[in-house]
């Protein structure tokens, strides 16, 4: 196999056209083998094989710098830059991350996982090159809907003004994670339909040079195009028309489902571990569709991740105009939600915890200053969520709980969540966010009668003395286990509290605990610093009550093991009980 002899881009350059085509098939075969066992981003990488080969054939990486947007489509790049073993041999599968990583290779220039950043990052590299009076090409590779992100458009807007070498490869596969949304994609289609000759051209309108490659999965055509723009003295867009998922029929035919995959059977495409039960995503879609039928003012909003809310293609069609996908544009999603709320609508914006930080300003300015009553549902904000350093869901508690006027809620069960969601949608006084628990969804069938408009009212679920355990959201059940262990080991029945609210404290309840409690334990699923527990500790600061805060130490974790992380942060029942001194 040719791939076995590729130790760097210099080896790619030695191959003939026919050999490069064989190399492309070998890369796909290796990707299929690994992803079927390991999981990962499927469609984006299968569509970028030829373009990656062509770039490394023409350009001189790492002197010529290639920046992949999101970098979820960088697997072929890794295979051609000295990391092939991580794709050829199962025992080495975990040697590399799923994104670009400078610690792995000099051919990776940034740790990237969020979208729409590549052009701006490339602009910076190009400017640094020019300041140092050096030579070299800087290439930004962007696709999978990333052009709909505001930062990408900002970068395009400035690129022509830069005045030096910058090559922007637009990987146009007519898809985001799901279908693309936004007017600019109509222009991309027009360019595809006219072989790049359409009079209306977004890129030319921004002052950029432009060439179109119709066959974006043909190595020879791509090599020719990249040779044309190599060493250009200005910014140029190379628009390549590729097929997402190319080489695996199921991925070609079902692009949304095969954007990312869990381990699967190659013959059938069926996942090796199937899950047919309810989760917070499916429950959210089911509830909202029912609510939409009852109230035409209810609208669900996503920023290119519809299935996180459970809105698969059939459910999006069922919702019709009451479902909005703004593309990869969290800022617009949040500001639009604020506008809908201000206009009398009832918006619900579902978003991964890791992407909330992309719209922090809109939450503060557009939502909370005027108290526009929109609902934000944050998914996967947990140690049990995504564990890549670029996608951690551990920051939303300190980030969101300190925004004035925002009510941030933490349910522990399906029933609590739906009660909170129902209240939030129908009330018109507060912007509300709901942090969904991590791990498997718990359903206890309890009827929830709590009035959530009585803000910051905690609930004592078990009354005891001496020790009080406040378990927030995901970690409420751990709090119950801590209380049980305390009673078994010491005979002391501990108080257990479900706080519900992240953004405020129940001063009356906390004051009452002073009467017969010596220790208050707080448990939270996220970073400790600036978080929930510190609010409790601050309340007891001048009293004799000792407060023990448990959560995750603030650090940039990458591909952590959950069990090890919990133990490292003293977040096991045995460790917590062991910290108590009677």
Language model: regions and residue ranges:
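Glycine-rich ThDP/TPP pyrophosphate-binding loop and its adjacent helix/strand module
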Residues: 73, 108-264, 268-277, 282-286, ...
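Non-catalytic terminal/interface segments that mediate subunit docking, oligomerization
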Residues: 65, 248-357, 362-372, 465, ...
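N-terminal amphipathic, basic-rich helices that act as targeting or association modules
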Residues: 1-79, 204, 215-219
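Glycine/charged-rich beta-loop-alpha catalytic/anionic-binding loops adjacent to active sites
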Residues: 29-36, 95-111, 133-139, 312-327, ...
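A glycine-rich helix N-cap at a beta->alpha junction
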Residues: 86-96, 161-175, 368-380
